Amino acid sequence: MADNTQRQRESISLTPMAHGLENMGAEFLESMEEGRLPHSHSSLPEGEGGLNKAERKAFSRWRSLQPTVQARSFCREHRQLFGWICKGLLSTACLGFLMVACLLDLQRALALLIITCVVLVFLAYDLLKRLLGSKLRRCVKFQGHSCLSLWLKRGLALAAGVGLILWLSLDTAQRPEQLVSFAGICVFLVLLFAGSKHHRAVSWRAVSWGLGLQFVLGLFVIRTEPGFIAFQWLGDQIQVFLSYTEAGSSFVFGEALVKDVFAFQVLPIIIFFSCVMSVLYYLGLMQWVILKIAWLMQVTMGTSATETLSVAGNIFVSQTEAPLLIRPYLADMTLSEVHVVMTGGYATIAGSLLGAYISFGIDAASLIAASVMAAPCALALSKLVYPEVEESKFRSENGVKLTYGDAQNLLEAASAGAAISVKVVANIAANLIAFLAVLAFVNAALSWLGDMVDIQGLSFQLICSYVLRPVAFLMGVAWEDCPVVAELLGIKFFLNEFVAYQELSQYKQRRLAGAEEWLGDKKQWISVRAEILTTYALCGFANFSSIGIMLGGLTSLVPQRRSDFSQIVLRALITGAFVSLLNACVAGILYVPRGVEVDCVSLLNQTVSSSSFEVYLCCRQVFQSTSSEFSQVALDNCCRFYNHTVCT
């Protein structure tokens, strides 16, 4: 009896759960749309006669909810129309806001205007592609004889080569140092071809198009005024955007720690940037940009879809995150394609670290340009070093898709991005502690050994300054700056690019502060040209400590290909290092000094409160001048900051 009572209670208690308040609304809505009462398969009666009390109550509730059902049906039928109306109203409001902002202050609204124009261009492109994509492809496709098509391609290649030679001849007439950078490109390419895995299988189309895209991007960014201004503006906006990190880090750590301690000043930027990148990835903006860049490289260079997507993704994400974009296809990729994936990871830096390097004071425009230029160059050099000799399964982009992550909403994406970056920050901090400690130990050991044979000041940096000096010179760096640049290259290759950029920022800060160029026999700073070329040369993960990171990341995704990854990882590392060096050579060919000449007479004839690079250059002219061009006031100003025999 007790058991029967218990079963009866259980059955009674389950009834409200099945037909309780949670499901009552949905049940009523479904029944009303079907034109029947809840819990009944019969149609609604004409009147309420003949209904019991429960049925009359349900019928009255049905009648009270009938307008809601009609409204719901109307909205469902005209959902597309309502969407268009909402989008139209929102677009009108945004356009009106933009017009008012531009009329009030165009300079202040410039960023919003540029963002709006970029969005409109992308929307117009998508609309044009959807409406006229197939027709445009048929129009631009060459319909002539295959022999004529071949001769047309050869003619265009010959014209491009002759044009490049003529341009170099005219452009380098005033700046012969640019020819050194061109010679560096030739030497590096010859060395890479000599170490190629399959010399006869090299796809010269991929190599030439990759280097051509790299050169065109560099030409636009470095030499043209619109490109230079655009990338400078973009770099300034990123710096302003990253400055908001201080609000969060100051609240957590305090203003004193954020201003004075490196870890609390730089590393929180990585967390903030990673959070933003995760949000952009959730919204699909990152995938859209990656697909467009990959499409451009694939149609010009003839590479496969998977390897091109990975290299394009490396512009924004790190060497371990980019393979996740093509994770389902890694098991079936050829060795040449895997080599491209590795080379792309070594040749670029992560977007989160880009923010950290900018916070050091490294030129933001050069960092952004180096990351973009490295993508086609990595594809080109990888196909030169490890050409394709197998049949790829991914020649077409059909069937290759990018995922949108696991986040269910915007807040989850932001939180996940911040949480993932904690591991990155901890890894960077640990590596800095370890590498700087190892560097100090190595320098102490080398100094101890050097003292035994009367070699004073022997260190790792000194050895690198001699061994890698020819490499720095082939980049186009002036000979007097080559020892410092060679030191930084050695730190980057054998230790870590983070440490190298930190050292470069100290050289730049001393130059901007107006420090003397030489302190004894040690150079205090390097020229602006050397700084720019070094920024390009250091932009990449190609160092020996990254071998374990790359192998660990890829092996965790495809464990059965561990032997394949181990076979080509060192070759990919060397190729990635050469990508950064070729980037620096291209920058060396294209770089021209910018800025207005300083009027030293007017600058020094007034009271100068602090030294700067301009003050140093003007004071050097004062100390070397034998004419009466500079007054005694100018000499006094210079003698307050610098010791010279003239001042005694």
Curated annotation (Swiss-Prot):
One Pfam entry name: Gate
Catalytic activity as recorded in UniProt: uridine(out) + Na(+)(out) = uridine(in) + Na(+)(in); thymidine(out) + Na(+)(out) = thymidine(in) + Na(+)(in); cytidine(out) + Na(+)(out) = cytidine(in) + Na(+)(in); adenosine(out) + Na(+)(out) = adenosine(in) + Na(+)(in)
Segments in the Cytoplasmic topological domain: 1-80, 129-147, 196-201, 284-294, 361-366, 447-457, 559-569
Cited InterPro entries: C_nuclsd_transpt, C_nuclsd_transpt_met_bac, CNT_C_dom, CNT_N_dom, Gate_dom
Domain of life, per lineage: Eukaryota
The UniProt record lists the keyword Transport: yes
Location in the cell: Cell membrane; Apical cell membrane
Keyword Cell membrane carried by entry: yes
Alphabetical UniProt keywords: Cell membrane, Glycoprotein, Membrane, Symport, Transmembrane, Transmembrane helix, Transport
GO CC annotation, single: plasma membrane
Record's bilayer topology term: Multi-pass membrane protein
PTM notes: N-glycosylated. N-glycosylation is required for localization to the plasma membrane and the transporter activity.
Listed GO biological process terms: azole transmembrane transport; cytidine transport; nucleoside import across plasma membrane; nucleoside transmembrane transport; pyrimidine nucleobase transport; pyrimidine-containing compound transmembrane transport; uridine transmembrane transport
Chief location category: membrane
Membrane-spanning residues: 81-104, 110-128, 148-167, 179-195, 202-222, 262-283, 295-318, 338-360, 367-386, 424-446, 458-479, 535-558, 570-592
Residue intervals on the Extracellular side: 105-109, 168-178, 223-261, 319-337, 387-423, 480-534, 593-648
Regulation: Due to its high apparent affinity but slow transport, adenosine could act as a negative regulator of pyrimidine transport under some conditions.
GO MF, one example: azole transmembrane transporter activity
Glycosylation sites: 605, 643
Tissue specificity comment: Expressed predominantly in the brush-border membranes of the polarized epithelial cells of jejunum and renal cortical tubules and in the bile canalicular membranes of liver parenchymal cells.
The protein's role, per its UniProt record: Sodium and pyrimidine nucleoside symporter of the plasma membrane that imports uridine, thymidine and cytidine into cells by coupling their transport to the transmembrane sodium electrochemical gradient. Also transports adenosine, an atypical substrate transported with high apparent affinity, but low maximum velocity. Therefore, exhibits the transport characteristics of the nucleoside transport system cit or N2 subtype (N2/cit). Involved in renal nucleoside (re)absorption.
UniProt cross-references to NCBIfam families, sorted A to Z: nupC
Protein family per UniProt: Belongs to the concentrative nucleoside transporter (CNT) (TC 2.A.41) family.
Protein name per UniProt: Sodium/nucleoside cotransporter 1
GN (gene name): Slc28a1
